[in-house]
Amino acid sequence: LVLDYLVSGKITAGTAPTNTGSKSIEVWAVGSWDGTNWPSVFDGTDSDETVTSADIKASVCRFVAAMACDTTADRSYFFGPVSLAAVFGGTLPPKFVFFVTHNLRTTTPTGVALNSTAGNHQIRIQPVFQTIN
């Protein structure tokens, strides 16, 4: 029986972020309430999602970590380890997914994407078990 997961990882910025003001990459966890159904736009798969509003994000996502970002292109930002049970208030949901957001910008109004190489992003979970001697 898994009691908890320690989550850690790295997310890599894209090219040429200008980052005027406070910029960050955030990692959020979203739980399924029954192992099948998911809140809002989430579906339990590795896919792009657009949350309807900041209020919806605040109600269905649980904050895991934030990484302050600078103007260095292709820099990896690391986080964790963080107790996932603590993120969900002490108990793990039946299933969960991670949701990454950022507000990095370039000099163009369209912003900057995160690094496009999949291997430059990692989110790892390490199970925590109870050991009885």
Feature roles, as predicted:
Residues 1, 75-77, 110-114:
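Extended alpha-helical scaffold domains
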Residues 51-90:
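Extended, solvent-exposed segments with strong compositional bias
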Residues 2-18, 98-100:
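A short beta-strand element within beta-rich, extracytoplasmic domains
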Residues 92-95, 101-133:
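C-terminal interaction-tip segments
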Residues 28-36, 101:
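Predominantly extracellular/luminal cell-surface or secreted proteins
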Residues 20, 86-95:
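Short glycine/proline/serine/threonine-rich loop/turn segments at secondary-structure transition edges
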Residues 19-27:
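Short coil-to-beta strand junction motifs in C2/discoidin
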